[in-house]
Every structure is written in C-alpha cells, then in structure tokens.
C-alpha cells in the first residue's frame, strides 16, 4: 500500500484467481480500517489498473460498487498507462505547453529575445520537464514530439528565425530538451547514490 496526501494505492502481484481474491480481501480490510477511523473513500473516484500481459480478469469492488477499470490514469500530475508506455504523458505535456506557447504568441507584441526566452523558461518548458526523470521517453517519435514544441518556440523569436534549429539554440543559450532530460537523469542518479550509498559503498558493491 502506498499513501501520499489524500491519494492511496493498493497493489499486488496477480498470477491467478487466488491472488485476485487476496487483493480483494486487502481492499476490504483497507475500507474497514478507513471506516473505523471515520474516514471515507470517494468510491466513485477509485479505479483499477491492470499492468502486464497475463492478466487475470476479476471485478474488484468496494462494498457493492464495482470499480471502474482504466487504461490511463494521472498520478501526481503524470499520466500512467497500463502498458507502462510514456506516450500519453508526452502527448499531454506537449498539449499543455503548446496552449501556453500559443497564448504567448498571440498576446506578446514586442517579441524581444530576452522577453521571449524568459517567458518560455517560466511558462512553457516546465510543462515539458515536470517529473521527467520518471517518464523520460525512449521512443524517437516521443522525443521528436517534445522537441517540436521548443523548435516552434525558437521560430517565434524574430532575431533568430532565419537560422537553423541548432544555431537558434546556441544564440538563445538553450539546450535541446533531450540533453536537459539526460542531464536531469544524471543528477538524479548522482543524488540518490550519494544519499543511499556514498561513492565508497557503491564501488564496493560493483566489485
């Protein structure tokens, strides 16, 4: 069981019908515990996601209410799919970023380099990088979809519009989004290894 703020997740490995029954019993115990402490789940918002290929079909319930089964669900702002592909998250992030970018293009009259870059960094790029270490894409089509947003932004800046994309990035002092994700992944690995092991213990483990 995992709990964060007002979100609760209960999960288990399912290899057959008995595992489904055990997970249902865990769900019943969780519901009983919540009621004992005078807390209530919003059952209409409770959902089931099955992850994997060999999936045992079972209708999970909370009291007499059958839980809705979903293929994609948002978890702490990130879209998770039952096949664990990150394409839905990439599409959603690009859609949000593109809406903001369109608003900037329509409303900003004086598109100086300094103003446009600051607006992009503040209002657009965070949509493309939120929690990216958890969903960094590995399919080329997803990488290109994300990069296309920054490509579109760079063409909105009059001072660099005539240049190629790589030259525009250099003049705007920007990295490609893939480079930034790779850098974020390296920082994440370094931070976690330092906190959990320390470099000395890590080298001993690798021997």
For each feature predicted by the language model, list its residue ranges.
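Hydrophobic/basic alpha-helical segments
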Residues: 1-207
